[in-house]
């Protein structure tokens, strides 16, 4: 009997969660707040993303054009493209180590290459997302170091590493500002 109740409860939660994800078509406060800051490209992206649930899904692949099974750094190459005939709709790249002013990311990919592939994906009509696994500013170890529970407090205003964290954010912002087409369109 308990097993049956657990199954029913799990099913109810799943249905409630799926219902919460259904598009309502209503504008949220955030939509109207940023309307004046949107570029034409941003509006186009948002409109296209809103259509996705009615048309299918978007498949993504991290570092897709940078390395794959048995290859690394080849131009115009992608495992997804080799299998499916086209690049994935979504690509992602990690900006970890940009805060350390390194030439390459924590995935050993040159930031200049990430920049170029971001522009290429934009030109193909695809979506790019970024992660940033920054090093632990408190311990100096990698992003997965959780040995000190005060790391978040150390980067907040008044924290011992707040200024360092702000400079790291500035490095990410500077990189993001370099993402533009030859015509000057910001990506």
Language model region names:
Residues 96, 100-187:
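Substrate-binding cleft of extracellular glycoside hydrolase catalytic domains
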Residues 3, 23-24:
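Short, low-complexity interaction segments enriched in Ser/Thr/Pro/Gly
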Residues 25-96, 101-108:
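N-terminal module-boundary/linker segments of secreted carbohydrate-active enzymes
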Residues 18-20:
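C-terminal motif of bacterial Sec signal peptides marking the signal peptidase cleavage site
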Residues 1-9:
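Bacterial N-terminal signal peptides that target proteins for export
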Residues 10, 51-54, 123, 181:
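Generic surface-pattern signal
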Residues 12-16:
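Core hydrophobic alpha-helical transmembrane segments of single-pass membrane proteins
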